[in-house]
A protein has these predicted regions:
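Conserved SAM-binding loop
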Residues: 1-92, 110, 173-177
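A structural motif corresponding to the C-terminal end of an alpha-helix
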Residues: 115-118, 177
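Short, hinge-like loop/turn segments at secondary-structure boundaries
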Residues: 31-34, 98-101, 138-142
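Acceptor-substrate binding/catalytic loop of class I
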Residues: 93-112, 125-126
Length: 179
């Protein structure tokens, strides 16, 4: 998904995947595209225009330090794009089972932007239907059916607009490194 999109707009892409299994899968998948896949931090001495954390930092205990270290590799005026699960009160056994340490709110990103002197370019919740489904499943202890998301995501985009992106099961943040 995202890699295909970014291949159209940039010539150099590097991926980081600390999981040994997923790392080797990504290396095989992107070998012919000449996309480099690293196990840990950005290790090359190159400045990036954009760094993406797509459903990553919720797995990292010291996520602020992780971001701080990688901001050194971001060009001035570059973008840090972070996608995370939203609202700690929605934390479920599913989150725990997949290794999520927390869920985030806009306040987390306001604090992050102040701490690292970043401009917030976009900060909004999305997947409002997912928000209500998780909330209902928590309140009624209903088992989750993952297949239902495939049908509801397009509908959720309509509801996100109706709710002005004030609620959602996920949060996207685009931060700009000051020039």
């Amino acid at each position: 998904g995202l890699v295909k999109y970014y291949k159209k707009v940039t010539k150099k892409i590097s991926l980081i995947e600390p999981s040994k299994n997923l790392n080797s899968i990504l290396k095989k998948k992107f070998k012919k595209d000449k996309i480099k896949v690293f196990k840990n931090k950005l290790v090359i001495k190159r400045k990036y225009e954009t760094i993406l954390y797509m459903d990553v930092i919720e797995h990292i205990q010291d996520y602020k330090n992780e971001i701080y270290l990688n901001l050194k590799n971001l060009k001035k005026g570059g973008f840090l794009v972070i996608n995370v699960p939203a609202f700690n009160f929605l934390y479920t056994d599913f989150d725990k089972n997949v290794g999520h340490l927390k869920r985030f709110t806009k306040k987390d990103f306001f604090n992050l932007s102040k701490k690292f002197h970043l401009n917030i370019k976009k900060l909004e919740y999305y997947d409002s239907i997912g928000f209500f489904l998780i909330l209902c499943s928590k309140l009624k202890n209903v088992s989750k059916n993952i297949k239902i998301w495939n049908y509801l995501i397009p509908l959720s985009k309509v509801f996100d607009n109706l709710f002005f992106n004030k609620i959602g099961k996920s949060l996207i943040c685009v931060l700009e490194k000051k020039k």
